[in-house]
């Protein structure tokens, strides 16, 4: 092993040469084998060289490095560099003195260690045994290398490793690059690639490595990491030819052919420029498989020791050449002008520029082709539209010519006039047909209005009576004078007393009364057009026709024995009755027994009890009509009360219950008349007790009277007045008008057949001061009690109903 001798103030230290080149920032190298336990011992300085040789081993920090915290990753060495010392001993054993002189580095002037890798390479080129693997080119400024399995074995003899990729990386670090032919065509390059598929040519960038020039070897120095990143050329290991055991040497790279290696070294692709970390070289530690097992183990142990002793290697990323930044002046002992004039740099720039321009040309050609296709489609579209425009212009010209011809022709104007005349004639015909139809429809509209008006008049005047139902409503209100009273035909507002009859009273304005059937009337509780009259002051007389009664059958002796009632001289005619009585006095709910016996059978009277009662009533009637009344049956004559007078008046005037024509409805009797309809009318008097009356069995013996009207004030009846004898047994089938005889002081009214005077007669007698003798009330009550005792079957049920009535 060679030794480097360095003088430092008279002291001499021996140290093994380091495999790392000096840094460009003049950081001092360290002795590799002088590692002692004292890591912080001071080291003397050399005044001449300003060189520090410490005894400790600390990794230097390169300030220009990218990773300051971990400087081990920024240093780059190989196992071939570590074995340079052993290679120098081999060369000295072969007898060459130049290698021995070069191994001794005299650093008095330069202060830097001598690089051994260049001398090893130079010795390999002069070795005749391996001249078929590595030899000089004809120009003597470059050399050829044939990579393969045999060349890897030779590398183990000089550098103690078999990695061809590491050998090529060391060449790049010392300024060697692969030679390319940039001015050849693609065909020539393919031919040359086929001829030199297994041969690589390398040349130094500054032409310092030449055959026979050993002095220039001193100028070849190892470059720094910055310079290597800017100028390093990478060879793909995949392009290497396959060996006998390719799996042992497969480290991720292979050389397929020279062209691929040439492309990766000098023409960096776009993907490599974008991701340079993908192409980083790797230094495997795989032993040679052909050696024996013992040798392999020894080599593995040596390699492990070398890895521990050597400095950590610096990875060199594969990136594009960068020429924009300035080159450090201390990196290489060359001037900037010499650096720019290097042929390798020019070749790299030219190759990368050609590659980039070719890529751009491809993109431009593709874009041009696309634009050309679009241009062709637009031309076709333009031609189609142009042809359509020509056709449209031709058609428009033809239409214009036709219009000119038609404008010059007079026959068209005449045809248009004829057409207008025909259309106007048809329109006139349609108008003439439409006018009569409107005139026909016109008379029907007033008729409809008249019908509506008639309907309204009927609905508003439903309580009025007239003989003509289909009268003209326009003449209804012509003869009516303005008056504060509601329209009612029975209100007499004139002084003279007209004859009875609705035609004379109403002058044909209102319809006549319909006494025969009350079911046709639209009954209501109160007239909405008539105000409620006062009960005390209402003394309006109502004119009504004298009712026609059937011939009465009564006893003349009984009529002669009855007392006569004297009436006053101011008695109104018989055709008038009191308004208050007719309006508010509830008339008797029961009619005479003749009506009860002669009424038609109803569905209510189908029970056997009712039939038996009817038979008994008939027998009693026959007995009373045949046998004369006895004197003992005659009751004591007593003056009649006002209620009994009303009851007698109701018996004498049965037509008053059915001949009412005022606005209020007639109260329906308990037993309807035979001529009236079966269904009873609802009004204010029978609405509350309608459900009770429907189930009530009528008794022919019983005669009930309603409460007297309150419009007549009660007057005390004098005891000196003559009495009227009325027998309770006398039951006349019909009533006749009372025989009235007038005298100077009083009027006497003879009541025949047990009939009572009317309310109007009693009222007149009270006004004039005359007295009226009435039958006693006790006899009527006794008679009622007898009837109640005779009909004791239904006394319990009827007693409650009589209280309600």
From Swiss-Prot:
SUPFAM superfamilies for the chain: Winged helix' DNA-binding domain
Superkingdom to which the source organism belongs: Eukaryota
Locations listed in the record: Nucleus
Region of interest called Disordered, as start-end residue ranges on this chain: 1-110, 273-336, 438-483, 513-675, 691-746, 759-805
Keyword Repressor carried by entry: yes
InterPro entries in the record: HSF_DNA-bd, WH-like_DNA-bd_sf, WH_DNA-bd_sf
DNA-binding region: 117-226
Role noted for this protein: Transcription factor that plays a role of repressor of filamentous growth and flocculation. Antagonizes functions of SFL2 and FLO8. Plays a role in the hyphal repression induced by secreted factors like dodecanol by competitors such as Pseudomonas aeruginosa and Burkholderia cenocepacia.
Protein's recorded name: Transcription factor SFL1
Species annotation: Candida albicans (strain SC5314 / ATCC MYA-2876)
Encoding gene (name): SFL1
């Amino acid at each position: 092993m060679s030794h480097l001798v360095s003088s430092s103030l008279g002291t001499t230290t021996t140290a093994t040469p380091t495999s790392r080149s000096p840094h460009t920032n003049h950081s001092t190298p360290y002795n590799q084998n002088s590692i002692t336990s004292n890591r912080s011992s001071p080291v003397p300085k050399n005044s001449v060289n300003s060189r520090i040789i410490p005894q400790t081993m600390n990794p230097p920090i390169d300030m220009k490095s990218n990773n300051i915290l971990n400087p081990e990753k920024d240093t780059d060495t190989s196992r071939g560099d570590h074995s340079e010392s052993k290679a120098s001993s081999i060369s000295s054993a072969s007898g060459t003195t130049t290698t021995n002189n070069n191994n001794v580095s005299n650093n008095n002037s330069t202060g830097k260690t001598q690089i051994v890798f260049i001398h090893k390479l130079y010795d390999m080129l002069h070795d005749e045994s391996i001249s078929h693997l590595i030899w000089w080119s004809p120009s003597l400024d470059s050399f050829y290398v044939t990579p393969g399995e045999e060349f890897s074995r030779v590398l183990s003899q000089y550098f103690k490793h078999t990695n061809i990729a590491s050998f090529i990386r060391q060449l790049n670090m010392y300024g060697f690059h692969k030679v390319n032919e940039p001015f050849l065509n693609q065909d020539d390059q393919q031919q040359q690639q086929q001829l030199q598929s297994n041969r690589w040519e390398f040349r130094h960038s500054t032409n310092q490595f030449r055959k026979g020039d050993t002095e220039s070897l001193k100028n070849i120095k190892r470059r720094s990491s910055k310079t290597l990143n800017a100028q390093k050329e990478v060879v793909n290991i995949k392009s290497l030819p396959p060996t006998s055991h390719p799996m042992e040497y497969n480290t991720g790279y292979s050389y397929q052919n020279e062209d691929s290696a040439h492309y990766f070294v000098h023409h960096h692709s776009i993907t490599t420029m974008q991701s340079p970390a993908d192409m980083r070289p790797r230094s495997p530690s795989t032993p040679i498989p052909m050696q024996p097992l013992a040798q392999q183990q020894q080599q593995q142990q040596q390699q492990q020791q070398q890895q521990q002793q050597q400095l950590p290697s610096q990875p060199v990323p594969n990136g594009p050449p960068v020429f924009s930044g300035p080159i450090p002046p201390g990196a290489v002992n060359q001037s900037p002008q010499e650096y720019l004039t290097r042929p390798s740099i020019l070749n790299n720039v030219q190759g990368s520029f050609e590659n980039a321009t070719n890529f751009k040309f491809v993109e431009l050609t593709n874009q041009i082709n696309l634009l050309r296709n679009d241009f062709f489609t637009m031309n076709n579209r333009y031609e189609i539209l142009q042809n359509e425009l020509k056709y449209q212009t031709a058609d428009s010209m033809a239409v214009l010519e036709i219009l000119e011809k038609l404008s010059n022709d007079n026959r068209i104007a005449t045809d248009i006039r004829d057409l207008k005349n025909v259309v106007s004639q048809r329109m006139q015909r349609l108008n003439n047909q439409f006018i009569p139809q409107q005139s026909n429809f016109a008379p029907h509209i007033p008729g409809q209005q008249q019908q509506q008006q008639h309907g309204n008049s009927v609905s508003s005047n439903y309580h009025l009576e007239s003989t003509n139902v289909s009268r003209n409503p326009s003449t209804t209100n012509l003869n009516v004078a303005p008056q504060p009273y509601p329209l009612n035909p029975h209100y007499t507002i004139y002084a003279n007393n007209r004859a009875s009859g609705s035609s004379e009273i109403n002058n044909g304005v209102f319809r006549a009364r319909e006494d025969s059937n009350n079911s046709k009337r639209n009954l209501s509780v109160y007239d909405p057009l008539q105000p409620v009259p006062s009960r005390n002051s209402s003394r309006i007389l109502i004119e009504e026709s004298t009712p026609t009664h059937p011939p009465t059958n009564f006893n003349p002796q009984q009529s002669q024995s009855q007392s006569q009632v004297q009436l006053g001289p101011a008695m109104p005619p018989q055709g008038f009755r009191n308004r208050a009585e007719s309006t508010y006095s509830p008339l008797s709910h029961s009619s005479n027994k003749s009506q009860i016996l002669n009424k038609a059978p109803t569905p209510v009277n189908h029970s056997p009890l009712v039939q038996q009662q009817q038979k008994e009533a008939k027998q009693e009637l026959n007995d009373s009509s045949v046998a004369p009344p006895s004197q003992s049956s005659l009751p004591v004559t007593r003056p009649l009360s006002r209620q009994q007078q009303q009851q007698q008046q109701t018996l004498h005037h049965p037509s008053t219950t059915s001949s009412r024509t005022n606005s209020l409805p007639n109260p329906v009797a308990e037993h309807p008349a035979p001529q009236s309809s079966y269904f009873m009318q609802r009004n204010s008097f029978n609405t509350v007790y309608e459900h009770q009356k429907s189930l009530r069995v009528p008794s022919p013996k019983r005669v009930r009277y309603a409460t007297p009207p309150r419009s007549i004030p009660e007057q005390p009846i004098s005891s000196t007045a003559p009495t009227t004898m009325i027998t309770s047994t006398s039951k006349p089938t019909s009533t006749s008008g009372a025989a009235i005889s007038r005298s100077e002081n009083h009027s006497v009214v003879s009541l025949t057949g047990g009939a009572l005077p009317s309310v109007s007669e009693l009222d007149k007698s009270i006004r004039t001061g005359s007295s009226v003798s009435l039958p006693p009330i006790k006899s009527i009550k006794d008679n009622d009690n007898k009837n109640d005792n005779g009909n004791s079957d239904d006394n319990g049920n009827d007693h409650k109903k009589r209280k309600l009535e």
